[in-house]
């Protein structure tokens, strides 16, 4: 059945401006399940639209980056983070004549498989799953779009294009890669993904480093005085003060962060252009055979590394964040253990027919939870007063 958008007039050429080494939707390696083409959207635009409308994408609104979801209304969630990544990635893709629609689809989908409670939840679930093959959130994101979403009558998942699925799978162990056919081959043969996938990866880094500064300052867990020891911050804070003397407080913080993001974007564009000029790829196949081409300059990489170390030492390892992480780990471990001991406590759709598959279905259930759902589920099972 054609979707309603196919009733619109055929679009003009949406990809004629792209570089020859960009990913072109008309040359996509296709979908697992063949579908008739749209007359109004490219294949990558269809991917993006499917991602936005899926259940897992809506759940990102209530999954955390650093702070547990109910800790404050202004802190980032996985949803706001994904939107920021997509905006940054599209801006850079436009400058480099790469495919904006593909890079947006990858950016919006890259965290679909993330657990509740951020990295603390991911680490806890991975520890629980170690005897059963482990848990990788990138692979879980792929499983969400390949199998777990239930939106279409003809197939499981979203049936996304190869290129979007490739970009979602940012990291993968060799053991898991060996089970993924063409999609896992690059991890076994040392090849690179598309430039759009490489770009989404670094746009993710630009976004989370800078919004973690913002959230850390809002929370009071890091201070402006501490940030003065970070060269990337100090330099752009001085520039902001010179441009707007007398302006302080939240406006100065926002202006400084804005300038840092801009500097990272400008540097990434320049570094990538230089790498592309040196490698001279003529097709996406040339990109796959080359070393990584989307890259910061060495000086910017060094400064970004100092910023990441600062955030690790002062924000992610702050005792209050560590307390939240300990609570999160306890919730994940308790839920996994009780469901493994008695799978009848699981919703029917997560009760495996084969007992050997049960741990993986428990992981699917827990990974799909939002922060507040995981807290409520833990309370329903373990809190006596709920009886």
From Swiss-Prot:
Top-level taxon: Bacteria
Keywords (A to Z) from UniProt: Hydrolase
Span of domain HD: 78-209
CDD domains recorded: HDc (cd00077)
Any GO molecular function: dGTPase activity
UniProt record, GO biological process: dGTP catabolic process
Listed SMART domains: HDc
HAMAP family: dGTPase_type2 (MF_01212)
Family in the record: Belongs to the dGTPase family. Type 2 subfamily.
UniProt-recorded name of the protein: Deoxyguanosinetriphosphate triphosphohydrolase-like protein
Protein species of origin: Ralstonia nicotianae (strain ATCC BAA-1114 / GMI1000) (Ralstonia solanacearum)
